[in-house]
Amino acid sequence: MANHSSAKKAARQTVKRTLINKARSSAIKTFIKKVVHEISLGNKENANLALSVAQSKIMQGVKKNIIKLNTASRKISRLSKQIKSLNESK
């Protein structure tokens, strides 16, 4: 356990930051799941709308250091590829 007051404060801040980061990470995952769900249903328009929202949230996560830029780019690229194949197939 921390003995110095500054160390105690840092421990409190870490707990607070961890909760915020977990909430943001969970929100990003939820938006990604919404895109995947719309793709599985075959809704082109809804999938495109969900992707634009998810892309925005993912990039906000990058800005807040929740996920790394390459990870975000990979996720967006894979979702875009799935939507593109959905649009071409039907």
Swiss-Prot record:
InterPro entries: Ribosomal_bS20 (IPR002583), Ribosomal_bS20_sf (IPR036510). GO terms for biological process: translation. One of its GO terms (molecular function) is structural constituent of ribosome. HAMAP family: Ribosomal_bS20. Belongs to the bacterial ribosomal protein bS20 family. Binds directly to 16S ribosomal RNA. This is Small ribosomal subunit protein bS20. The gene is rpsT.
